[in-house]
A protein has these predicted regions:
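A conserved beta-strand-loop-helix scaffold within acyl/acetyltransferase catalytic domains
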Residues: 1-23
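Short acidic (Asp/Glu) patches
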Residues: 3, 36-42, 71-78
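Short coil/turn motifs at secondary-structure junctions
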Residues: 4-6, 28, 59
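Conserved acetyl-CoA-binding loop-helix of GNAT-fold acetyltransferases
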Residues: 20, 25, 30-44
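Generic beta-strand structural signal
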Residues: 21, 50-52, 87-89
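Conserved active-site alpha-helix within GNAT-family acetyltransferase domains
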Residues: 48-52, 56-83
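C-terminal "cap" of GNAT-fold acetyltransferases
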Residues: 76-117
Length: 117
């Protein structure tokens, strides 16, 4: 349900991030609170991370649970440098170990196969 990714706001230290992937509910079960219950449970399960992150298909679900959009530009770190990803968007969840963050700063994540965000 989540993978460890290392997000880095600007030139600040890397943040150990629980990056959530593949949240979906079968259409016939939507609207019954299943995804909300799973995401609430997930928030308690990832409390030892510095940050929660995801790329939302349905932002309203996450917004009502405290997730907020990163407002600054997004980049992917590669061995050759940073790649701008202006088409990407991410939301973050502040956790007990989350440092003070300026969400307008650029943020980068390490390269991964498949979808970058």
């Amino acid at each position: 349900m989540w993978v460890t990714r290392w997000l880095q706001p600007s030139n600040q230290p890397l943040l150990r991030t629980a990056y959530v992937e593949m949240v979906a509910t079968e259409p016939e079960f939507q609207g019954r609170g299943f995804a909300t219950a799973v995401m609430r449970r997930l928030a308690s399960a990832i409390h030892d991370f510095q940050l929660g992150g995801l790329s939302p298909a349905e932002p309203m679900l996450y917004t009502k649970l405290g997730w907020v959009f990163w407002q600054g530009p997004l980049f992917i770190r590669t061995k050759d440098g940073l790649i701008s990803t202006p088409e990407g968007s991410i939301m973050i969840l502040r956790l007990p170990k989350t440092p003070c963050l300026d969400l307008t700063l650029p943020v980068s994540a390490g390269w991964c196969e498949g979808e970058l965000w």
